[in-house]
Amino acid sequence: MRTNALRLKTASIFSVDTKHVGVLDGVRALGVLCVLWFHFWQQTWLMPMYATPFLSWAGVQRINPDVLRRVGYLCVDLMLLLSAFVLYLPYARRRFCGTQVDPVSTFFKKRFARIVPSYLFAVIVMYAVAMAQGAYKGKAVFALKDLLTHLTFTQMLFNDTYLFTGITAVMWTVCIEVALYLVFPLLANAFGRRPLLTYGVMVLFGVWFTICVSPAFGEPRIMVNRFLTFLPVFANGMMAAHLYVWYAERVRHKAIPSILGTIAAAASLYMIFRLFRSCAAAGDASHQQVWQMQNRMFLSLAFTVFLLGASISMKPVRKILDNKVLSAIAAVSYNLYLWHQWLIVKLCSALGAKSGADIANGGVSMQWTVTITGLTVAFAVAALITYGIEKPVSRLILNTGREN
């Protein structure tokens, strides 16, 4: 009896959880915060540097996160990669563990409950404010088109509603998510049967469309975020989930795999920094968009290695990402993403600022005041909508109790 109990205890210590990967909450939270930082920086031009006297022995006197704030939007790719990973995880468990996946109807019902209530609330409120402030004055046809396309997740089909919406620019990401949901059951089943073939087709088709087709159909700002350009990102996310569950069924959290995972996470983090710096050095927005199209596959590979490495890394390393603070941020991350840019823009506008230069001219204290106020309001709004609208409505749609 004691021997069996010891074996069960040992198995629980070294087993890998394939139902909930804790570090993903931390990665999601940090990804959203990077995007938030970029949009806040656009409005305030706040560029702090941090003194590091404790690193003086290594010749590092200060840390300047300029690269991160200038190209933090690249973490949108990370969040889409995470979506593919999480969505495919049950299918990977079916392949390697023999578990069941939800029927297609249940899959769509859960996706609807997850994103639509908060999204529709945001669209309606932001549109109403835009109308009240005269954003559509003299543009009645566009006003109707902007609303209808956003309500139907089709705004990216039209250049005007994608680039010049009166609602908020970040909504395009939800369109990409919805497009992924619509085809995901087909992709997941194909990936489950022929993972290497499906992965190769998704990557090659996505790269071909991005490099060969996109330049002929529009300028970079129009084509950079089309659904097909993200196929390699989705493929890498699905492959990451596939490899993670494969690992979980064959290897346990012992010393050597954990050390190798930690090394892989550190190395990939360095590569991500190098890629971010390369994008920042590309030039203005249009040149950075060209860089994105040319390097999206490489960046998503670096993100993939980081996800896998961090997920199987040593426990102290995993705890950096898998903790209550980042989990709390991850819980409200969807609404934080939907609202943060709109809120900081409205805050700066209320102060009479027309650009980041106006806030910067008010001095560093003004920049910090606006930033901290914006963060406070953004998190408060995100929490209120998450727990006041998203979760209650989701429970009604799914007919589940509070504990679920």
Tell where the protein language model's regions lie, with residue ranges:
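Membrane-interface helix-boundary motifs at transmembrane edges
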Residues: 97, 136, 188-197, 244-256, ...
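Membrane-interface helix-boundary signature
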Residues: 14-27, 65-72, 222-231, 253-260, ...
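Alpha-helical transmembrane segments of multi-pass integral membrane proteins
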Residues: 73, 234, 239, 261-391
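Membrane-cytosol interface segments of multi-pass membrane proteins
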Residues: 1-211, 216-217, 327, 332-333, ...
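Extracytoplasmic catalytic-loop and juxtamembrane helix elements of membrane-embedded
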Residues: 137-148, 221-222, 227, 282-288
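Surface-exposed beta-loop-beta
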Residues: 211-229, 236, 243, 247-251
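Transmembrane-helix signature of polytopic, lipid-linked glycan biosynthesis machinery
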Residues: 159, 208-221, 270-277, 312
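Membrane-interface micro-motifs in multi-pass membrane enzymes
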Residues: 73-75, 169-177, 225-238, 296-297
